[in-house]
Amino acid sequence: MDGSNPFTVLGNNGLTLKDMTQGYATLANQGNKPTLHIVAQVQTANGTDLYNAPTSAEQTFEANNANLVTKALTGVVQRGTATEARATGHTIAGKSGTANDSNAASFIGYTPSMLTSVAMWYPDANGNP
């Protein structure tokens, strides 16, 4: 999302799952925008590190603001549209999403140590999401 499209403000310009993951990872990291990694660490069975992704982060907004958003998103999981995420037994901040015509559903949520994002689409007759 580059902000050059005026429809972005209105919510009409689609975000990729990567965009959403980056934004929520920044919230989970108290306003520090981290470098995203599909695999952060690989260890042997005895705990020897084989790979550690390089880490870096850029402070993009104040930690207090990120914490306020996290508190609101925790309410979504506790009392809102994402209550099934409570089954993990952990405090989770997150948001569910659906399309108006019920052809897509998504959830993105985080704890202080993990973020998960899922998006599913029901394809049309041509196989397009």
Predicted regions and their residues:
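Primarily short, surface-exposed interaction patches in extracytoplasmic proteins
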Residues: M1-D19
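A penicillin-recognizing enzyme superfamily signal
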Residues: G14-P129
